[in-house]
Amino acid sequence: MLLVDLFSQSNTLQTLTTNDNNDNLYSISTIEIPLKSSQPILTVSSNDIFVNEQTKRKNQLVLMNENLKKTFIESPIKEPIIGSLWYDKKQKLLLLTETKIFTYDLDTKIIKAIIDIKPTDDKIFKCFSMFNNECSLFIAYNEWGLKFIEKWDVNEDESWELMEKFPLNLGSNEFIGTILTINDNDNFNLAITIYNDFTEEWRMELRHLETGICFRSILLSRYDRENDYRMIYMKNMISDIKWLIYSKSSKKIIAINSKWKKTYFPYKFPIYRMELFQNNSVIIRTTKKINIHRFT
């Protein structure tokens, strides 16, 4: 496994060797796309890449197809966008702010707020997640000692309804960085990054979604309370690496393999967002550019 080469020398063609017994070789290339944003977002569908361009003069969404042709969409959203998801079943982009969730419809080109989803008890949204081809949205709040995440379902009339609250029961000195819902062979799990203020440590946990019981945990980093740790799940990739974890305060990526062993490797810039695209590319978003690392 030489996945380090994929990131450490992003301007050249590299060779990636998997840890299987066939000694297969894979070519790696990188495409750099300049695009500035003070608060970058990144989401992918099966064929498209969604990012934003937010500067003092511009506030717009940018849609790129698989050929990297750009379409610019002016955004009416005044609040900072803190998260985004691709809603595959309805072919819509979901955009999260601290108080609202918006949709962007690819057919109508309209951005509008989901009026049914409102923060409980005037809390502040932190992050959200969704299973592929599902009509359920999981939302977590930005607070210490978070006790649950909410599950919202969409009805036939396109209205949304709060259906369940799944337990988290964090300690009073803990908060989450992000959540990610995972479906492994019909096992529905929740991946979470958590900061503990007493130990001053970040950790990642895997929990059973319905019970909230943790069945896997790994320490990530210390002394970085101000910057959340995020993650992507490397399902169906050629490498043995299963998770990539990152923070915008660090130029190091934490890679976790199938045996839950960590490897640290450097990247040239602080990473704000990262996504897996079409099972053969890793896209990395910084404040100044989009790097698409593609291997075949």
Language-model-derived ranges and their functions:
Residues I192-L206, I213-I256:
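Loop/turn-rich, solvent-exposed surfaces of beta-rich toroidal or solenoidal domains
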Residues I238-T296:
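C-terminal closing repeat unit and adjoining cap/tail of repeat-based domains
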Residues K123-R207:
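Solenoidal tandem-repeat scaffolds enriched in leucines and small polar residues
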Residues I49-F50, K92-L93, C135-L137, F188-L190, ...:
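Hydrophobic beta-strand positions that form the internal "hydrophobic ladder"
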Residues K56-L63, T99-D105, F125-K126, C135-S136, ...:
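Structural motif
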Residues L13-N22, V44-S75:
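Beta-propeller domains
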Residues P34-S46, I77-K90, I117-E134, P167-D184, ...:
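Repeated scaffold domains used in trafficking and secretory/extracellular systems
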Residues L3-S37, N65-K70, S258-K259:
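A short helix->beta-strand "capping" segment at the edge of beta-propeller domains
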